[in-house]
From Swiss-Prot:
Involved in oxygen transport from the lung to the various peripheral tissues. Signal peptide: none annotated. This is Hemoglobin subunit alpha. O2 binds at H58. The lineage of its organism: Eukaryota, Metazoa, Chordata, Craniata, Vertebrata. Belongs to the globin family. The modification N6-succinyllysine is found at K7, K11, K16, K40. It holds the Pfam family Globin. GO terms for cellular component: blood microparticle; haptoglobin-hemoglobin complex; hemoglobin complex. Heme b binds at H87.
Length: 141
């Protein structure tokens, strides 16, 4: 459960991401594909090369979903319901992949926002991404 301090940290950190959200989302995906090659199996139709339009497009989708989650941090299950349905019933993404992408997002944010990525902010973002992952996998049952 996210504390009020966690919510404040997440909103502040995501606010600093600003217009770079799509780029950071794409970078996190690239990190995931390089670090965890098995994740590529969910994207057989994508050009997974560095800077590809498809990876950039999906990175923007990831970032947009996180922006929605930040804006609706107190009601993520409703805000992300359609996305949860998509990943559970149509895409059938193995839930472990959300943890892998979350890790890559944390690394990307730490690399781009080093002065803002304090231990407290890191912990809050980690809890937030775990909450998003839980919501996205909630309909697998």
């Amino acid at each position: 459960v996210l504390s009020p301090a966690d919510k404040s940290n997440v909103k502040a950190a995501w606010g600093k991401v600003g217009g770079h959200a799509g780029d950071y989302g794409a970078e996190a995906l690239e990190r995931m594909f390089l670090s965890f090659p098995t994740t590529k199996t969910y994207f057989p139709h994508f050009d997974l090369s560095h800077g590809s339009a498809q990876v950039k497009g999906h990175g923007k989708k990831v970032a947009d979903a996180l922006t929605v989650a930040v804006a609706h941090v107190d009601d993520m299950p409703n805000a992300l319901s359609a996305l949860s349905d998509l990943h559970a019933h149509k895409l059938r993404v193995d839930p472990v992949n959300f943890k892998l992408l979350s890790h890559c997002l944390l690394v990307t944010l730490a690399a781009h926002l080093p002065a803002d990525f304090t231990p407290a902010v890191h912990a809050s973002l980690d809890k937030f991404l775990a909450s998003v992952s839980t919501v996205l996998t909630s309909k697998y049952r």
